[in-house]
Amino acid sequence: MKLSKKNIIHLCVLTGIYLLFVLALTRFKYAYGSELDWGGQHYAIPDYFRKLFYKTGDFFPSFAPNIGCGENIYNLSYYGLYSPIILFSYLLPFVKMSTYIQIVSIIGIIASLWIFYIWMRQKFTDNTAFALSFVFLFSAPLIFHSHRHIMFVNYMPFLLLGFMAIEDYFEGKRKYMVTLWAFLMLMTSYFFACLLYTSDAADDLI
């Protein structure tokens, strides 16, 4: 879909509002995230994945010798073991993981916002798409978890693209895209996805 000048203005305004929220939260001196949880988990464990890869050269390790007394590394999959977002950091070993996680968290919300707006614009008027996107941006789960528990929201761009791809699928367009976005979404949070395949968990979800 080609964006009009008004669409671009809407996206810039929405992005600006979100960045002002980030600025108000951090005030140029605080981390965009929970210093307690992120310092001990969301920074530290992905950084351990990256360091272990560079130390061993093993892309599929099975054991984390330096966590506790050593444990199965898949116990830590909750923290993005094969998430495409975390894997990209392997290409940037010179960037501190604390900096990287904050940046990708902010970029992830902006990407989700833009994708949602474009999706809504395909169905509604410009102003309605803007209003819906504003509500989406400041929905409590999205805005809260973006700086508290990133694994609950970092799959969002892939989920939205997956929804758009499903619509394309039923219209006979680009059928393979559903598989692509679903794969990336599941790799981002496959720790939770596996629960769908257990009968007890499925009953609880229903």
Give residue spans per PLM region.
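Hydrophobic transmembrane alpha-helices
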Residues: L113, Y117, R121, L159-D168, ...
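Transmembrane-helix signature of polytopic, membrane-embedded enzymes
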Residues: F116-F138
